[in-house]
Amino acid sequence: MTSKAVVFAYHDIGCTGIEALLNAGYEIAAVFTHADDPRENTFYASVARLCAERGIPLHAPEDVNHPLWLERIRQLRPDFLFSFYYRRLLGAELLACAARGAYNLHGSLLPRYRGRAPANWVLVNGETQTGVTLHRMIERADAGPILAQQAVAIDPEDTALSLHGKLRKAAGALLRDSLPLLALGVLPEVEQDESQASHFGRRTPADGLLDWHRPARQLYDLVRAVTQPYPGAFCQVGEQKLIVWSAEVVAGNHGREPGSVLSCDPLRIACGEDSLVLRFGQRGERGLYLAGTQLATELGLVEGARLRGAACSPQRRTRVLILGVNGFIGNHLSERLLRDGRYEVHGMDIGSDAIERLKADPHFHFVEGDIGIHSEWLEYHVKKCDVILPLVAIATPIEYTRNPLRVFELDFEENLRIVRYCVKYGKRVVFPSTSEVYGMCQDPDFDEDRSNLVVGPINKQRWIYSVSKQLLDRVIWAYGQQGLRFTLFRPFNWMGPRLDRLDSARIGSSRAITQLILHLVEGTPIRLVDGGAQKRCFTDVDDGIEALARIIDNRDGRCDGQIVNIGNPDNEASIRQLGEELLRQFEAHPLRAQFPPFAGFREVESRSFYGDGYQDVAHRKPSIDNARRLLDWQPTIELRETIGKTLDFFLHEALREREAQA
């Protein structure tokens, strides 16, 4: 019986995949592709033209995961889905449309080089082998079981274009051999070895900047990885851009400074190790393709001149304003941005205990203050900085019922003032929404663009936080329609060191895990609200901060006007399970003998713990399709590891408190 397929394809490997399916006897019910981007050099064959010539129904929707398209695909009743170099991630609902599975052809030997542009990355990294992989698609990008692979040798002279040609031939051969076996159901699957996995993100033209302090071999690899039809490697000669299309490595650099012109015929440049001969290139985006010697003449180069590359190109750091910089997200994010080397961080908070380690950094600027009082400083720094993160909020459940008006005043009114400053001065705002905006949504996975936001009755004041955040989300979205650049991110139960303080837990104003650890530290029963049956998806702060840093980076403006869940759907656990794992690790911890015996678990009602205005939700699980698609991001840290390092941090804090009181 003929197998029916729905295909998602782009590029000439998309054409290769379609041809292979037809040759293997598959019925193609529909093909989904992308409209060509006029800004992109489309050197590859057209899926649209092939489908038109073959009479195959073709679509190019903006969002193939939209419910309308999902329903149309379900109506086709496909046996298989295939993705051949399609550029968007297929969501879980879409993958489930195929009766016999969904499969992707990836341009590397998985699990290595997951992600974008693998053919370019293997050349940048000087690899000698790559290949193609046919694998089953799961929610995580490029992570499903492998059905078949074919290796491709990378020659020292290969460029991205020549390697692409090799991969296209390998893909054709692999699909020719594999597709008939897949239709028969006799193609075995092998799980990927996660310990061998590597992930690479999308490349942009700016990534072609040459750093002459690097070894010549690395620069040669960069040149061949991004040469035509890609934008090319480049450097600066005075105020002019020099694009390098072809180069070769020559031993030695005469002991000269990196970037120095060693000769003009040939045009030879000193590198951190050895030197690079620029064989062909052009001056500026519209210049002629010239030999290196003529380029030297055109650019007025002489022996001893210096070319500017990545190491000596002056570029102002992006100024990021973090309000609430001493908080859990703020201090971890500041550390990550400063480590990156491209950012200058300005911060305000009412304390600084969590950021003492950062104060010595010359690119970190801190002022102790209150956003509700220091309005002139606040407005000035919104005007001065490039990206604004208002992280100041009351975000602990007991305060929602205990101080609802204070929650509204700070979380909504004060933050609205900051948003309006961003509108006034044309600044980009990265705003922390919350997973709580989904409220009592019944969807199995909470989707940023489709899930309903459901809250309880007015007399349940715990929803004041959720609706304050939701209203700000809607205000920001409306300002976005008038030109405000924004991204909304929704953290799902981030955990890790410096989450909050044991003192906060003592007055009930902390996150759940801190409360649980406090009971272990003090030898009191662990209180499980309503039995601890509530499920959450816990996210390691390092995973979360990496996603947030990519939002701030915002390559190609991909995050503008977007809402992004940042959570780990694989780390779902009930509060009881969280407590049990904490107890297991606590009993095995080297510091265990310093603390009292475990006092057991005690179930309590939410009303007695939080007050009359509380109402809980049974589960809170994110869809992270947007994060995968926009950020090339995937959480990797397991819950057990996150619990371990969070516990270790608080146990050491407890001992420091004890020593200070002695």
Curated annotation (Swiss-Prot):
Positions with a binding annotation for UDP-alpha-D-glucuronate: 395, 400, 434-435, 462, 493, 527-536, 614
Binding annotation for (6R)-10-formyltetrahydrofolate: 116, 138-142
GO cellular component terms listed in the entry, alphabetical order: membrane
Record site: Transition state stabilizer: 104
Domain of life of the source: Bacteria
UniProt site (Raises pKa of active site His): 142
Positions bound to NAD(+): 349, 370-371
GO BP terms, alphabetized: lipid A biosynthetic process; lipopolysaccharide biosynthetic process; response to antibiotic
Assigned EC number: 2.1.2.13, 1.1.1.305
Family matches, as Pfam families: Epimerase (PF01370), Formyl_trans_C (PF02911), Formyl_trans_N (PF00551)
Pathway this chain belongs to: Nucleotide-sugar biosynthesis; UDP-4-deoxy-4-formamido-beta-L-arabinose biosynthesis; UDP-4-deoxy-4-formamido-beta-L-arabinose from UDP-alpha-D-glucuronate: step 1/3; Nucleotide-sugar biosynthesis; UDP-4-deoxy-4-formamido-beta-L-arabinose biosynthesis; UDP-4-deoxy-4-formamido-beta-L-arabinose from UDP-alpha-D-glucuronate: step 3/3; Bacterial outer membrane biogenesis; lipopolysaccharide biosynthesis
Function field: Bifunctional enzyme that catalyzes the oxidative decarboxylation of UDP-glucuronic acid (UDP-GlcUA) to UDP-4-keto-arabinose (UDP-Ara4O) and the addition of a formyl group to UDP-4-amino-4-deoxy-L-arabinose (UDP-L-Ara4N) to form UDP-L-4-formamido-arabinose (UDP-L-Ara4FN). The modified arabinose is attached to lipid A and is required for resistance to polymyxin and cationic antimicrobial peptides.
Family stated for the protein in its record: In the N-terminal section; belongs to the Fmt family. UDP-L-Ara4N formyltransferase subfamily. In the C-terminal section; belongs to the NAD(P)-dependent epimerase/dehydratase family. UDP-glucuronic acid decarboxylase subfamily.
This protein's name: Bifunctional polymyxin resistance protein ArnA
Organism: Pseudomonas aeruginosa (strain ATCC 15692 / DSM 22644 / CIP 104116 / JCM 14847 / LMG 12228 / 1C / PRS 101 / PAO1)
Lineage, opening ranks: Bacteria, Pseudomonadati, Pseudomonadota, Gammaproteobacteria, Pseudomonadales
